[in-house]
Amino acid sequence: MAQDYILPYIDVMKTDLQPGIIRVRTYVTTLEMRARQLATDIFSTPAMIGLMEGTCVELTGPYLDENEQTVGTHVDVRHMAPTKIGQSVTVKAELLEVKGNKLRYSVTASNDEGKKIGDGLHRRAVINTMRFGKS
């Protein structure tokens, strides 16, 4: 059963952080991103998720105040097709929902052949870095 976790309250978050904001970023896959357990150089699921999370962070960053950051709270992603190391991967993140300090995103990834390789949902929470972890 899913459970909501209460994260530290934040004082201020810029009000222009609204659903519908989109960030698209293209990355070149590297050997560090490969699925090491395979004999071939194939882009790994953890690396894809990392790029998706990073794109969400970049999308949200300009809307945060100086002492704010986001932390990941949930990932629900499908990795649907292989991508060879060296290919480009384009990640699209769209902010779907803002509820207090909780953010929900749609994420997709496609390779440079235009093939969709992954999609899903990601959740993050805005935290005050001056107070986070100091309870």
Per-segment meaning from a language model:
Residues 1-4:
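A cross-taxon signal for low-complexity, glycine/charged-rich
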